[in-house]
């Protein structure tokens, strides 16, 4: 017995030693506004940290240490009080015991909304989870939004708890205990002349666009299939490296900031392990800012990995990471604001745009209840009720109107969806159905089983069976990729969906902007379509079954040649040629 006690004493002593503590990873899992979300000058932030030792850690914002007096320990979490004066938005990370956490982007902009807790939701008549007492009001633009929201809150016994001020949107907590009371209040508030729309949130926050239609089995390519070859991924990396650093005529590039609307990334995976702490290197490099995830194969890790994963570690390989040593660096910011569904996605997007993002990756989308796929069956993937869809439509319309007015150089890249349905039917699919020059819609393809074809052969790739289609889709890209893993040099599971085609295009757009930052959204779309390879048959602009993969290639996109073999076919991303046209656009004046 004395010997056993001695062994346990040594074991407990070793667990409490600094050496063991130093081996425990420090991870920042949550960073959200708390307290008064409407306060702009003095802000409160709540942090949840894994691996936090005793005492307070060092907290650094964009490389500057924040005073210890601004930080308070709350169990396993921290509360930060930050004075906006003297600070700017930037990466925030912790240091303790020789360890550095993952950096997370902290925005000082004022768009934040609350997510409902588990006791604040209910099932509606469609069987969908909906918020009981939290709704958002879009106030008419001729009113002072904050003042009018406060007036309406007083009138109906509610409280203003969140806001997206640039869109004149304010979130109210209603005095409603069930959906009958909520719907009655929504009808009354919606009839106010100052209210443009009421946004009712229906949220399934743990799911993104990652799930393909579950009601039919879908074949995935073999794990050793080089899906990205169909978009000339390696050719594009090689071209960028050689052309930018060419001895005869080197190119000057610019840094680009990309926003990815996702929840988190697993920094325990080898793909992302070297992004911990400050993003410093002798030369500019790709930086990644995100909350830490529990699993390496989650949606956010896979989407972000296509842009930023470290090479030769197994799992994924990031396109922008492959441009290091030639580029001036890319900042990839993974941000979701909160788990308040579509409203939070828009709030995060507004903050990121105000923080200088040029490209937004939206690997998400929703279908209305009752939407039909190309076979006439009902879509059961990511559906929302009619009342929610009408509010979302108004919210997204306000976002794109604001984007066109205040930030006309920003481009949103959006997934077409995985419902085997139509992307352009505005009454059934959002946001891909919006027609605006600042929204690029991406469909998905995979390698065909035919052997010996040239990469530019239209039959080299085929449409992913679950990918949404029609003429609103601008271009297709590889829909299948490998997930990240916890094991070094291990091959991850194959994940498929238009979610993963979207960052292929977003990364290409970011690289194009680094080569020519003067490119406008409509010019980027034109260059992507002019450079595109083709996929599918030649339908002479009108497929017999009305299933356009993308908008057909036009003669104007092929030098006005009516007899060009590409005319009438659908567009498949050519990453290398798109970069080449971006370089040539530096000298051309239209």
What kind of feature is each model-predicted range?
Residues 334-434, 488-503:
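Substrate-binding/access-modulating region of protease and related hydrolase catalytic domains
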Residues 41-54, 63, 132-142:
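A short glycine/threonine-centered beta-strand motif
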Residues 262-264, 429-514, 518:
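Extracellular S/T/G-rich loop segment that most often corresponds to the catalytic His/Ser-adjacent loop
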Residues 22-57, 99-127:
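Beta-strand/beta-sandwich contexts
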Residues 112-128, 187-257, 269-271, 372-374:
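Protease zymogen maturation seam
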Residues 125, 240-344, 355, 369, ...:
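Subtilisin-like serine protease catalytic core
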């Amino acid at each position: 017995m004395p010997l056993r006690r001695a062994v346990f004493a040594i074991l407990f002593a070793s667990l409490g030693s600094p050496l063991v503590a130093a081996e425990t990873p420090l991870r920042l899992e949550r960073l959200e506004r708390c307290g008064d979300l409407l306060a702009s000058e003095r802000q409160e932030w709540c942090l949840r940290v894994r691996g936090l030792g005793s005492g307070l850690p060092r907290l650094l914002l964009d490389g500057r240490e924040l005073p210890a007096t601004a930080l308070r320990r709350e169990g396993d979490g921290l509360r930060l009080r930050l004075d906006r004066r003297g600070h700017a938005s930037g990466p925030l990370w912790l240091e303790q015991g020789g360890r550095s956490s993952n950096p997370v982007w902290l925005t000082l902009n004022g768009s934040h909304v609350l997510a409902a807790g588990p006791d604040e939701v209910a099932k509606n008549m469609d069987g969908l989870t909906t918020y009981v007492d939290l709704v958002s009001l879009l106030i008419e633009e001729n009113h002072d939004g904050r003042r009018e929201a406060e007036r309406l809150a007083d009138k109906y016994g509610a409280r203003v708890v969140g806001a997206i001020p640039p869109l004149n949107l304010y979130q109210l907590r209603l005095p409603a205990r069930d959906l009958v009371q909520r719907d009655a209040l929504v009808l009354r508030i919606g009839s106010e002349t100052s209210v443009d729309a009421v946004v009712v949130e229906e949220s399934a926050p743990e799911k993104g666009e990652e799930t393909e239609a579950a009601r039919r089995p879908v074949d995935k390519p073999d794990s050793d299939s080089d899906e990205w070859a169909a978009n000339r991924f390696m050719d594009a990396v090689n071209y960028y490296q050689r052309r930018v650093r060419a001895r005869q005529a080197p190119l000057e590039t610019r840094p680009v900031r990309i926003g990815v609307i996702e929840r988190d990334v697993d920094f325990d995976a080898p793909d992302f392990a070297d992004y911990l702490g400050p993003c410093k290197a002798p030369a500019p490099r790709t930086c990644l800012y995100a909350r830490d995830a529990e699993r390496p194969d989650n949606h956010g890790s896979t989407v972000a990995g296509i842009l930023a994963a470290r090479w030769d570690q197994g799992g994924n390989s990031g396109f922008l990471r492959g441009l290091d040593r030639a580029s001036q660096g890319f900042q990839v910011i993974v941000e979701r604001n909160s788990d308040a569904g579509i409203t939070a996605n828009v709030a995060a997007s507004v903050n990121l745009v105000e923080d200088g993002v040029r490209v937004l990756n939206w690997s998400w989308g929703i279908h209305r209840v009752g939407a039909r796929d190309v076979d006439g069956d009902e879509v059961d993937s990511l559906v929302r009720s009619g009342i929610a869809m009408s509010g979302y439509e108004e919210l997204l319309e306000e976002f794109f109107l604001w984007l066109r007015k205040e930030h006309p150089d920003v481009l949103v890249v959006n997934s077409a969806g995985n419902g085997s349905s139509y992307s352009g039917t505005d009454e059934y699919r959002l946001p891909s159905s919006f027609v605006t020059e600042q929204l690029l819609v991406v469909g998905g393809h995979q390698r065909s089983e035919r052997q010996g074809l040239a990469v530019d052969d239209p039959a080299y790739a085929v449409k992913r069976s679950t990918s949404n289609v029609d003429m609103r889709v601008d271009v297709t890209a590889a829909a299948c990729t490998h997930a990240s893993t916890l094991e070094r040099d291990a091959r991850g599971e194959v994940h498929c969906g238009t979610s993963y085609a979207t960052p292929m295009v977003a990364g290409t757009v970011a690289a194009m902007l680094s080569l020519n930052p003067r490119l406008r959204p409509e010019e980027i779309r034109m260059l992507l379509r002019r450079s595109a390879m083709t996929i599918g048959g030649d339908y002479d602009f009108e497929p017999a079954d009305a299933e356009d993969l993308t908008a057909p290639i036009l003669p104007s996109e092929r030098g006005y040649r009516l007899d060009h073999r590409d005319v009438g076919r659908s567009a498949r991303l050519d990453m290398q040629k798109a970069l080449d046209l971006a370089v040539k656009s530096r000298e051309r004046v239209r």
